[in-house]
Amino acid sequence: MIIFNGNKYACASCIRGHRSSTCRHSHRMLIKVRTRGRPSPMAIRDAILVDSTSQSTEYENGAQIEGDCCSAMNQQPILFVRASAVRKARMINGKLHILMEEGFTAHEPKDISTFTDDGNKYITETEFLRKHSPKAPATGTISPDSTKSSSSSEKKERSRLQQEPIRHFSNCCKKDKSQNPASNGKTNKAPSDDIFTPYGSLESTSAFNDILQENYNSSVPGAHDSSETLTPQSTTTIAAPHSSDVASKVEVLTHKGIFLSTQCSCEDESCPCVNCLIHRSEEELNSYIQQSGVPLTNIGEAQITDKMMDYLDDCKCTDKECICPPDNCTCDGCFSHSTNIIPFEKFFFYGILNARLTRKTQIKFKGKLVPSKYWWDFLKLQVPLMTDAQLELLDIHAWFQKLVSNYAPHLSDATTS
């Protein structure tokens, strides 16, 4: 789980039941966790993606933190990604669909689930980019966003901070290589456990080469129908764009000299490290950052680049072998994972949370077969995160009744299947 803009995002695969202490949340969707109120059946959810390059590594060349401490402490810079605007989207069959505002035009999608009850339409990322993506700025130009944020006073402050020695506000966890043989001549890798970031901060390597993805429903999507990755750009010069590139969308900011650690060798009950991601709470880390007094510094802009990350889109199955997870297989004609039909009444006997549902499950309700594309997000992603109070208020029969009445012409009859 990570925290982005004050909201929690959990690994969709872990939510679906594939929880693992070694989950790196890479190549996967991070879905916004709902904690309050009763979610709408067709609710639009925010989501972000994390790629395989986003795992943090040790800040090898940085100054050592002063103070007595454990030998496992490393130094991870804190990055903030500021989006210029925000767009809403929905996950439909594992793919991102962008909500179209009034005034936009798009070809009507074939999938009826791309329509909302109020008449709004969704289109795929690819279709959106083809029609509405802004042109990338020419080489050597300064983007409007960076111009606005780069006043003379900010430039002076940034120059002063770059010339100052790096400051660390930690009374603990000095990196002692003599006490840590594993670090001799090598760079320790950060643990593979999931790492959260405090109050909208995003972690990265010290060189800022690996940055977590922009909010998956970014306002100006710049990836193909798979994923979005942030790569750093200069604040004053932008590389010559390729035909598939789009304009930079976000500014990347950081607290210079302030680091958090993804490793710690202290005992769980007696860790004094104020910048420890393992033993400090969100509130403590946020307080540590604020009390440092170090202002945010703009270190450049992030541009969306094309990377195949969505494991649902990157299917490598063949006619002879299917390597999809049993619950997520969408391969046509797959002999390993066949379509199964379950009666709606099964929920009353086993409960919603106990019924085994897959992408190929069809729920028989009122003489109709309801494919997973109509209920997957709600039953598999939203319901498991509901509180006991929310579950008590949930009328699953009424929910399915409304779904079938809305989409009846597009559902198969159970008697003819």
UniProtKB/Swiss-Prot annotation:
GO terms for cellular component: nucleus. SMART domains: Copper-fist, Cu_FIST. InterPro entries: Copper_Homeo_Regul, Cu_fist_DNA-bd_dom, Cu_fist_DNA-bd_dom_sf. The modification Phosphoserine is found at S143. Residues 179-190, 228-238 have a biased composition (Polar residues). One of its GO terms (molecular function) is DNA-binding transcription activator activity, RNA polymerase II-specific. It is found in: Nucleus. The keyword DNA-binding applies. GO terms for biological process: intracellular copper ion homeostasis; intracellular iron ion homeostasis; positive regulation of protein catabolic process; positive regulation of transcription by RNA polymerase II. It comes from the Eukaryota. Sequence repeats lie at residues 264-279, 322-337. Pfam families: Copper-fist (PF00649). Residues 153-178 have a biased composition (Basic and acidic residues). Residues 1-40 bind DNA. Regulatory protein involved in Cu/Fe utilization and stress resistance. Involved in basal level transcription of FRE1 and H(2)O(2)-induced transcription of CTT1. Regulates the transcription of CTR1 and CTR3 via the copper ion responsive elements in their promoters. Required for degradation of CTR1. This is Metal-binding activator 1. The lineage of its organism: Eukaryota, Fungi, Dikarya, Ascomycota, Saccharomycotina. The gene is MAC1.
